[in-house]
Amino acid sequence: MFQYTLYGDGIHDDTAAIQERIDSGACEVALPVPEKHYLISKPLTIPSNFKLKLPRYAVIRLADGANCLMLQNKTVLRDEPDPNVFYYGRFSASRAHTCHDFEIEGGIWDFNNQNQEANPIQTGHFDDRYYLGHVMCFYNVRNFRLSNLTIKDPANFCVTVDTGSYFTVENITFDFNFGNPIAVNMDGIHLNGNCHYGVIRNLQGACYDDLVALNAHEGTRGDITNIQIDGVFAENCHSAVRLLTVEEKVEHIHISNVYGTYYQYCIGFTKYYPGETTGYFGAISLDNIHAAKSFRLPIQEAHMQNKTRHFPLIWMQDGTVVKNLSIEHFHRREYVNPIDTIRVDKGACVEQLWILDLSLENHTQSHCPKLTNHGTIQTLRTEGLPAEEIENTGVIVNLRCT
């Protein structure tokens, strides 16, 4: 029936055989349990109205020296590429060319990063081969689901979504063991600009950068709105969630049920890139956060020029604008690092901040602040956090503590 043999022996290349089955016209392909593991040397390309299913713990591995994505959606090339947008600028963003209604389920997706080229963010090697170091990349997509799988040892990000709407990413395990060349810039689920109406839930395992990133000023750049993140579980992870904007809106975001220890920050409102801040974070809700700091291991700080700099668990970076933020049911039991629990940096502006039910058990030998403000807070409302426990060197215009 098929021209290409599906081996699954870990020796022969299975790329053509798997892609042939994907392209067969069937609406679903379920790969059998492999003899050893599947081996691919080129990206698998997923069309609309299609589901690819692997046995939950079947390994699919990127061949040595493949230097490519493992999986991508079907795209249409633009007549005139956008020279200002690397990789994504080649593809059409037209609704007529959207890849839609597809699903990937199961498998252990092993990028085999020690046997690929190094992370291009570290090497600066961005050329016309478009090697990203990502495991999976989705562009101009709608109504898709990624579920019940493990992603192992990427060179860069595990999953990147750019210009995507109405999606679910759930029940994902991260298995990170090495960096190439170093353990940094290795995100879990990474959203670039123009992503809306998504659910990201039940993510487990530590990453060597942001476990979830909502980075509006990256890729095609654009607003990120209406995203629910529910259930992040990680021990000794870089960070749980980063939100990032310079010129864009990041709003209507709900982050809940975050557990674990984090060596950089737990949730960060960041700018990172230079330029005038014209964008903002708005209508952000954080609740049921159980987090503390962890020690940084040598592999995790090898790239750091300043190893003495530490970040709070909830961080509003210099240059950011937060219109409204609520933090409810935040519980910290700290044994490692008494850095601030919540901090607004100098040069950051928060228009409305609500804090309800913030608890701290400090088992270190040093003072551990609950809330530190070096910036500007227009309106601050707290319940259970008295004014005398707020460390303020900035400006708080309206303060109400009950």
PLM regions and their residue ranges:
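Extracellular/periplasmic carbohydrate-active domains that bind, remodel
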Residues: 1-402
